[in-house]
Curated annotation (Swiss-Prot):
It comes from Arabidopsis thaliana (Mouse-ear cress). It is a multi-pass membrane protein. Its main location: membrane. InterPro entries: EamA_dom, WAT1-related. Coiled coil: none annotated. The chain crosses the membrane at residues 48-68, 82-102, 117-137, 146-166, 176-196. It is found in: Membrane. This is WAT1-related protein At3g28060. One of its GO terms (molecular function) is transmembrane transporter activity.
């Protein structure tokens, strides 16, 4: 059981890391593509999965996958979304405070909020992040980490589309197509996974029933 459990977690983590890496790498600019008929690629100095920048990507997305798995196990043992979100926010705040003290050691003015916009951004970020973490905790509690991971590319697609509509940002065709295809793939994988589990449970119950009849 332990070996099967570790294999399942390893597969989930690998799949989620692949989602993040593929979505990050499949960025090709779509600005003016309808007019010129060709896709304009991003500058060559964009970080890729090679060298120091690539190592940062791998570490970041691996830690995200591990965090989802740990979050799933915590929710199964202690099903309280708000308590988990509070603990998470306190730990993150303390960590950010220590990092900020180290980075801005010689710049005390960095701690001063110079406008109301900064305060509004801080409050909005706290509210949105806390709400999203509660929703994520609720999702992994009832659906598992795979279900949460398969919608992550769609969140990237949504952010890209809304940024292009309201902020005039570049729309990356790779993010739209790649995120959609990966999400469809995860949906199919999740459906097949549940079907396989159903057949496995049915076969197990059938075997136990036959054993009971023989006894």
């Amino acid at each position: 059981m332990a070996g099967r459990f570790c294999q399942r977690d390893g597969g989930i983590m690998t799949a989620m890391v692949a989602v993040e890496i593929l979505t990050e790498c499949s960025q090709s600019s779509w600005n003016n593509s309808l007019h010129c008929g060709v896709f304009r690629h991003l500058p060559r100095n964009r970080p890729i999965i090679i060298g120091s920048s690539g190592e940062v990507f791998w570490v970041e997305y691996t830690l995200i996958a591990v965090a989802y798995i740990v979050q799933t196990h915590i929710m199964r043992e202690y099903p309280s979304e708000f308590a988990l979100a509070l603990s998470h926010n306190v730990c993150v705040s303390i960590s950010c405070a220590f990092v900020s003290l180290f980075v801005e050691e010689n710049n005390p003015s960095a701690w001063i909020m110079r406008s109301k916009i900064m305060l509004i951004c801080i409050v909005a970020t706290g509210v949105v992040n806390s709400t999203s973490y509660v929703v994520e905790s609720w999702t992994v509690r009832y659906k598992g980490a795979v279900f949460l991971a398969m919608f992550r590319p769609l969140s990237i697609v949504t952010a890209v589309v809304l940024g292009a509509i309201f902020l005039g940002d570049s729309l990356y065709l790779g993010s739209v197509i790649g995120g959609t295809l990966i999400s469809i793939g995860f949906s199919v994988h999740n459906s097949l996974f549940h079907i396989a589990n159903g057949f496995s449970a049915l076969a197990k119950s059938s075997v136990l029933r036959h054993i009971g009849m023989l006894v």
